[in-house]
Amino acid sequence: AYIGDFIGWHDRARTHFDSYAASQVTDVPATIPHPTQDTALHLARSVKKWGTPHYSNGYICRTPYRKDQMHHYDMNLCYIDELLWHFNWTGDLDYVRKMWLVLTSHLAWEKLNYDPDNDGLYDAYCCIWASDALYYNSGAVTHSSAYNYRANKLAAMLAEKIGEDATPYEKEADKILKAMNERLWIKDKGHWAEFQDFMGHKRLHESAGLWTIYHAIDSETADPFQAYQATRYVDTSIPHIPVFADGLDRDYETLSTTNWMPYVWSVNNVAFAEVMHTALAFFQAGRGDDGFNLLKGSILDGMYLGKSPGNFGQISLYDAVRRETYRDFADQIGITSRTLIQGLY
């Protein structure tokens, strides 16, 4: 959906957004309180029952124009992020008015599900590409909190423009940013924690993944020095993999998504979209040369050296187990368009 506006297909982008807005649940209030985890799945997912916090008003189902499908992913965050960028790029306030309830229902749903203790930090559940093997056990998570910070901040701005009350969204954005800086930013290391544990000693997971760094920067939770420090964490703590071939003018690099071991699908891959989003974060942090090197290294890796030249794939040939996987992968297409336009240009 990101790329539609870049190539002038604003109407096509709105068709996409309208189709999933029509999939947002609007007539199922949350009547079953937390916790509603599925015991048959060892409490790893919400039980699939209408009226639970997860499957209630605000939830966006997986198929266009279908409000009756339960799925375990929370793709609300990605959809709303794309929608907010569409508002930003087009300035179409009539469309903002049309989609206002979609946005506010989403924000209420996120708050109900992922910040029920109202501390300003959100749990994360199946809401990013890498989430298949991520689980935070109700912890306070950087990437989901950053997504919700940006959504509330922009909701406040949009509310003022269309005559709605901006106050609740301003307050929530301020609360999130304050909590992220006080509890998730590791001052002596210069980056955000992956998350803070909900139980026990409430320890910080200090080995953050790429998604922690780039989402926090992309959602504008960082000041300029924080952004620089966080990208230096990528330099020093995330594995760098050389990209080389006969005829290249110089050596390039790509990245693993984490430094975690052992290898597990979705949490320490070499994934094109993850590298591209990190490249965008480097551009946003004022490190354009390093961002360009990551961008070009990833393009060479997948679109030149890969088995399907010119294609936007999902996983790199440098991935230890999966190797090259999937073609025409939308995550990669969308974020590469943003990195080219908002980063390089």
Whereabouts are the PLM-identified features?
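Active-site lining segments of carbohydrate-active enzymes
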Residues: 25-71, 87-113, 157, 214
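Acidic/His metal-coordination segments adjacent to aromatic residues that form catalytic metal sites
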Residues: 42-69, 124-141, 315-324
